[in-house]
Amino acid sequence: RFPVNDSNKTSKIEPRPDSDIQFFQALLEGIASIEKEAYEKLHELGAARPVRLYTAGGGSNNPAWTAIRSQIIGTDIVQALHSEACYGSALLARSGYLAANPA
């Protein structure tokens, strides 16, 4: 439930627009807004604000989704060189391993 830990928080999908396209766009904008809140929360906790975000996975191939995220978050979003989502996880694991096991 990051960035807001509230088990009583309810969904806000009503009133639903008549247009399925408008409804879908609103859902994507809502998801991007939550992502923005997450970066803001991380900044409150001491992390630097992102200057550029790298995106991976299936959604990274959707230019409309990338544009929505970029506009709402307010930063450049570029497709990662390796677009499989697991690649980032592997890099984080490697980084953690190297930090715990210096040469």
Residue ranges: model-predicted function:
Residues 1-91:
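Activation-segment/catalytic-loop signature of the eukaryotic protein kinase fold
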Residues 96-103:
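Acidic, glycine/GT-rich loop-and beta-edge segments that sit at the periphery of enzyme/chaperone cores
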